[in-house]
Amino acid sequence: MALHTVLIMLSLLPMLEAQNPEHANITIGEPITNETLGWLSDKWFFMGAAFRKLEYRQAIQMMQTEFFYLTTNLINDTIELRESQTIGDQCVYNSTHLGFQRENGTFSKYEGGVETFAHLIVLRKHGAFMLAFDLNDEKKRGLSLYAKRPDMTLELREVFQKAVKHVGMDESEIIFVDWKKDKCGQQEKKQLELGKETKKDPEEGQA
């Protein structure tokens, strides 16, 4: 499921802050600093998620893979999101902007007159982060995982599994991404190579 779509469809309530997150090795409610924003400005891979609501689970199953780029703007506190999704045999591109609230550590998306929120959970040690949604609603709650590399370590997998159980869900509800099904990575690589060749041609013509 696309990151911006998740932010539109789900809204967060801070029930998790009332729990003890140490059991899942996660920290809730940390302020978002410029250092964090610099760390987030990178390429990210959607690794998996656990969502209670059926249509959200189905949306994840329809999307084979997703990677995206985050570019932060410190002047107006927004984040540009550029994503590439593999859906079937197609590579689908999309771009949008996210807001963020520094004090309570949340991302936000304003759509159709409604602003929804997701709590950012940084897993810096693992080069990853999670987003938590609707944790007070047993039928809608969800947790998603993103990492800087598509090859997930066993330790990161276990951290996410523990976090999912900690918010009252079951490991069986997790859908992990199979990056062997990615169609967008090769396309991006070809576009980058083509761009390099295009830059070389004018130089060769002047030689």
UniProtKB/Swiss-Prot annotation:
Keyword Disulfide bond in annotation: yes
Disulfide bonds: 91-184
Keyword set, alphabetical order: Acute phase, Disulfide bond, Glycoprotein, Secreted, Signal, Transport
Comment, domains: Contains a beta-barrel that binds various ligands in its interior.
Any single GO CC term annotated in Swiss-Prot or TrEMBL for this entry: extracellular space
Chief location of this protein within or outside the cell: secreted
An example Gene Ontology biological process: regulation of immune system process
Glycosylation sites: 25, 34, 76, 94, 104
SUPFAM superfamilies xref list: Lipocalins
Protein name from the UniProt record: Alpha-1-acid glycoprotein 8
Subcellular localization, as worded in the UniProt entry: Secreted
Family: Belongs to the calycin superfamily. Lipocalin family.
Residues that span the membrane, as ranges: none
Functional summary from the UniProt entry: Functions as a transport protein in the blood stream. Binds various ligands in the interior of its beta-barrel domain. Appears to function in modulating the activity of the immune system during the acute-phase reaction.
Secretion signal span: 1-18
Tissues/organs with expression: Expressed by the liver and secreted in plasma.
Key word Signal present: yes
Pfam families assigned to the protein according to its UniProt record, in alphabetical order: Lipocalin (PF00061)
Other known facts: Eight genes coding for different forms of alpha-1-AGP are present in mus carolis.
InterPro entries given in the database record: A1A_glycop (IPR001500), Calycin (IPR012674), Lipocln_cytosolic_FA-bd_dom (IPR000566)
